[in-house]
Amino acid sequence: FCMRDVSHQCIGEELNGHGRQNANMMGKFVENISESKDYCSYWEIDWNNLPASADYVSDQDFWYNLNANFDVMNACYRLYLWTGNEVYINDPRFEEFFRLSANEYIDRWQLQADKIMERPGVMHEDDARVDPKFKTFRGLPSYEESVRGLTVTGDLIATIYRGLKSYAQIQRLGGNEEAALHYESKVEE
């Protein structure tokens, strides 16, 4: 299961009676964020709860679309609104994923408003590695995967916007108005 696909199809899957599966998949995505992967998670996870071998060699060599963290944030907020399941907004694994995505992830991948237009297209690559499988696919700035050399795209900006708006709302639901206003102001930058 893939971060993008699960995020985009989760409400339909709720309608199909797959709420337990949604919570499980989202939980797997959020619990696998790590500094060693530059605050990415696993793009795809297989039925053995392992990163899909088609997209992952190691924590330094893997496929990742930068939109994914923000799509998961928004999907979790929508799932909470749809189901009332507080796991999506109060579980410590989810809270940590949201916090890291809204801060360290943005910083690590230069997704701030004052840097996003000038960021390099390929980042965080160790040149000492011989023939990395995913050199130009680790940190794709779009879900458009066939165009090389992109540094920023409209779909990335849109997912950042929506993810941070969702996180601000989650903060507000938790009674943290100051944090909600902070993340809303980041959106307006």
What is each of the regions a protein language model found here?
Residues 44-71, 86, 106-184:
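The feature captures the catalytic groove of carbohydrate-active enzymes
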Residues 1-77, 81, 86:
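Substrate-binding groove/exosite segments of carbohydrate-active enzymes
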Residues 17-40, 81, 94-114, 185-189:
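Long, well-ordered core segments of solenoidal/helical folds
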Residues 2-5, 71, 97, 152, ...:
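Short, glycine/acidic-rich beta->alpha junctions
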